[in-house]
């Protein structure tokens, strides 16, 4: 998972059997025995130490360090009002203080619990210290979790060896940069990926797909990418084998050629599983390319939980799981993308990857399902990204749902399957910001929500408006997501949002370049952007987009927003007006409440700064050279 190791320094050891000191540059690590505990100094100031939570009848409530049958326990000290951030894509409060968080990738089936698709055992404190556990195994974090200890960070690592980084930085930006220096920087995504991505589950056939694409262009809707989800181009019973459903796509080339003629990029779906009903299953099993069952020595037959499926998304077939630890299987899967890219596909939606859930599973590498489970996502991401690097003429770029430490090297990720309601919108924003605080700079959500769609036009509008300021912007869910399907008022508001998105592309390009160089996400939480403002940290739903824009998404019906602006003067951003008035200026260090009209946004620029804007275009193949500065 590491792409490099830290620069080695000359270590100086002093001490005896009871106490040992290790000096390295500005750092000094003091180790004590009986029981083992430590203090970490930087420039002679304690920056972290073992938890000091004592107990009435014993020395420690929890051991500072311990090796158990389940793995390792490490307990770190927390200040009384100390916040902790990171730990991957999480839907609840960004400040993990008080939470029990598990670093384990789930098919979360929503955004309503602690379970999530993208995890990494990396956390940081505004006080400057960072913890990164370098392991593929599950890690449980009791972050000031009161049933364990409200004054300690308790880390339970389910591994035989303990490999962890504990370091200190002067700012959250430097903290994330250090973590990314270890695990890998994200390449800059192609410009077209910053445009609008249109999708749904799912276009029934080529006639519907082309009809929607033509309507998009006829209505002058800004859009760059159209997506064929899993059931849109594959036969569900026999997927996945890189085969077009012959009953609907006897010859897919003319269909893709027509989409190309309309200046669409094309995204197709995949998952790393092969139906037992496909001849490829027997071939892959014979070659040892599938995850095996320890009990039989044969390919493990994965059986789906049928409860999430219904009339639209029908049950999936029993399947084998591709073993990415087998070099030949990895190469086969990568090379199998070549015909898709040669046909005109530009992007892969790499779905699933969380299915190694059973310790009876065994990989070619000798790892069990539990040990391989998390890192499998990263191997899957890497394989697909390498295929795009090798064969895609317009990429590489993909959307992956599951991710682990290092997956940020293979952009980008999207936030799984949110419920189509206001809670789903709010949780999706938090998930995006949490992933960004964990080293993942590029993210998208399902605009409108994925499941339990009630055709709530106001929700759809607000979701689209918030997503204008995310790294990537995708309209997706069960059922149509074209703006006009929500009525005239919603369509007008979303069209305005999409037009603004394209005008912001020069600004967003700069933000993605900075993300690639520094690890700072396009969407930055207030805690990350304003680490020295304790009040700003409390506003977890608003965020910075790039360096200049504070975005206050509307996450409740009726248009009410509550927000805080840091110190200084701020100007309300309105790309349609190049001359802001005194009424558009807001004093910082204050809290505000407003009611927004359906077409209104609460976005602010620090007074004196400018935002570069491009022209109004419908896709990135159009001339975008003319730029202006706002204001």
Enumerate the language-model features and the residues they cover.
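Catalytic core of carbohydrate-active enzymes
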Residues: 385-396, 403-414, 427-428, 435-445, ...
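Aromatic-lined carbohydrate-recognition surfaces of secreted/lumenal glycan-active proteins
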Residues: 194-200, 228, 260, 264-277, ...
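Catalytic and substrate-binding clefts that recognize carbohydrates or anionic sugar/phosphate headgroups
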Residues: 4, 11-190, 200-201, 206-207, ...
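Secondary-structure transition/capping motifs at alpha-helix termini
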Residues: 186-189, 217-225, 250-267, 292, ...
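Active-site-proximal helices and loops of the catalytic beta/alpha 8
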Residues: 230-233, 243-308, 360-397, 412-413, ...
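Conserved, mostly hydrophobic/aromatic
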Residues: 26, 122, 216, 259, ...
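Aromatic-lined carbohydrate-binding/catalytic grooves of carbohydrate-active enzymes
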Residues: 187-366, 408
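Flexible loop/turn segments at secondary-structure boundaries
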Residues: 131, 138-142, 202-206, 232-237, ...
């Amino acid at each position: 998972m590491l792409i490099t190791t830290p620069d080695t320094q000359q270590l100086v050891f002093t001490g005896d059997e009871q106490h040992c000191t290790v000096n390295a540059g500005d750092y000094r690590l003091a180790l004590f025995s009986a029981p083992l505990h430590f203090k970490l100094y930087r420039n002679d100031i304690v920056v972290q130490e073992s938890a000091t939570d004592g107990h009435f009848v014993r020395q420690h409530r929890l051991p500072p360090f311990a090796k158990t049958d389940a793995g390792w326990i490490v307990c770190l000290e927390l200040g009384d009002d100390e916040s902790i951030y990171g730990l991957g894509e999480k839907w609840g409060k960004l400040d993990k203080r008080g939470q029990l968080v598990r670093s384990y990738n789930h098919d979360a089936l929503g955004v309503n619990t602690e379970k999530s698709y993208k995890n990494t055992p990396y956390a940081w404190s505004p006080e400057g210290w960072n913890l990164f556990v370098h392991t593929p195994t599950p890690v449980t974090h009791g972050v000031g979790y009161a049933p364990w200890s409200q004054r300690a960070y308790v880390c339970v690592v389910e591994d035989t060896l303990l490999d962890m980084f504990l370091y200190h930085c002067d700012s959250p930006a430097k903290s994330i940069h250090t973590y990314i220096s270890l695990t890998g920087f994200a390449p800059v995504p192609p410009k077209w990926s910053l445009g609008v991505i249109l999708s749904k589950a799912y276009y029934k056939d080529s006639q519907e797909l082309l009809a929607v694409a033509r309507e998009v262009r006829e209505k002058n809707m800004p859009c760059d990418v159209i997506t064929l989800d899993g059931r849109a181009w594959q036969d569900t019973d026999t997927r996945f084998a890189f085969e077009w459903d012959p009953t609907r796509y006897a010859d897919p080339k003319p269909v893709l050629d027509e989409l190309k003629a309309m200046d669409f990029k094309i995204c197709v779906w995949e998952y790393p599983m092969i139906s037992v009903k496909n001849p490829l299953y027997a071939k892959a099993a014979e070659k040892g390319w599938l995850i095996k069952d320890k009990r039989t020595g044969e390919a493990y037959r994965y059986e789906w939980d049928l409860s999430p499926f219904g009339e639209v998304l029908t049950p999936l077939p029993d399947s084998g799981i591709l073993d990415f630890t087998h070099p030949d299987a990895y190469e086969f899967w990568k090379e199998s993308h070549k015909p898709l890219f040669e046909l005109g596909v530009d992007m892969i939606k790499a779905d699933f990857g969380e299915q190694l859930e059973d310790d009876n599973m065994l990989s070619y590498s000798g790892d069990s399902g539990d040990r391989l489970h998390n890192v499998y996502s990263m191997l899957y991401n890497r394989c697909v990204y390498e295929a795009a690097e090798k064969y895609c003429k317009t990429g590489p770029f993909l959307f992956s749902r599951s991710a682990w430490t290092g997956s940020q090297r293979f952009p980008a990720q999207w936030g799984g399957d949110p419920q189509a309601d206001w809670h789903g919108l709010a949780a999706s924003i938090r998930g995006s910001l949490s992933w960004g605080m964990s080293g993942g700079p590029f993210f998208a959500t399902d605009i409108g929500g994925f499941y339990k769609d009630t055709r709530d036009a106001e929700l759809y509008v607000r979701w689209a408006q918030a997503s204008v300021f995310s790294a990537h912007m995708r309209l997706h869910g069960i059922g149509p997501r074209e703006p006009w399907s929500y009525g005239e008022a919603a369509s007008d508001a979303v069209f305005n949002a999409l037009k603004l998105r394209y005008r912001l592309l020069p600004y967003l390009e700069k933000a993605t370049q900075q993300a690639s160089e520094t690890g700072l996400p396009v969407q930055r939480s207030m805690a990350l952007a304003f680490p020295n403002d304790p009040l700003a940290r409390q506003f977890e739903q608003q965020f910075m987009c790039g360096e200049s824009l504070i975005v206050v998404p509307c996450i409740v019906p009726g248009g009410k927003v509550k927000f805080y602006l840091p110190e200084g003067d701020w100007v309300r951003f309105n790309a349609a007006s190049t001359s802001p008035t005194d009424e558009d200026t807001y004093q910082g260090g204050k809290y505000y409440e407003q009611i927004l009209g359906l077409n209104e946004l609460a976005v602010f620029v620090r007074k004196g700064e400018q935002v570069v804007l491009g022209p109004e275009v419908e896709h990135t193949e159009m001339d975008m050279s003319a730029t202006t500065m706002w204001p």
